[in-house]
Amino acid sequence: MKSISLANELAGNSYPGRGIVIGKSADGKYAVTAYFIMGRSENSRNRVFVEDGEGIRTQAFDPSKLSDPSLIIYAPVRVLGNKTIVTNGDQTDTIYELMDKQQTFEQALRTREFEPDAPNYTPRISGIMHIDNGTYNYAMSILKSNNGNPDSCNRYTFAYQNPVAGEAHFIHTYMEDGNPLPSFEGEPKLVGLEGDIDTFTSLVWENLNEENKVSLFVRYIDIETGKYETRIVNKNK
């Protein structure tokens, strides 16, 4: 698979929706993840990321404007031991709870399907990073309707063992803007990963569509020690 520019990929798409990037820093020292949310409606744009323990949760920026919390208020990031879970919905909790009971990432996600927001049927995208004694691997998943048919759920898992320095994979909910919104197709995109946490955070944030971007979370985890650094950027301040 040809590696593409994450900056170009983001800049060329006004509405990828929600997106997860997972990979390894160019110097090979850090496990890297980014999660962003975008919005077209007032309800969807009325959000910020806030820290919550070792993870984050979404929160209404202006509680008086919150019309429907069901699919927009959740914990995108949670940490279970040496595993970091990143998703675009409350399946974060499903993965956390079932993996805590010794089930696998894939088994946990078999209990879930795409979101019930007809006619988009937004895919549920998820990622998990596992860091153990200086080793690092990750997996990504997408649960989506069968070409807009809600009677059938298609589940795909992609696992990346011993990832290469300077490479990441990018998955997002929608191919592009539209009505209804077309679900992501294919396997996660191979993108280059350069620079430190601040450089990478700026690259993602600056290339997301100005009108539609809402919040961004970035974390660099030291593969040797498990210690991490986090950046959160919110459009609403």
What are these regions (language model features)?
Residues 1-237:
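Conserved short alpha-helical segments that host acidic/polar catalytic motifs at enzyme active sites
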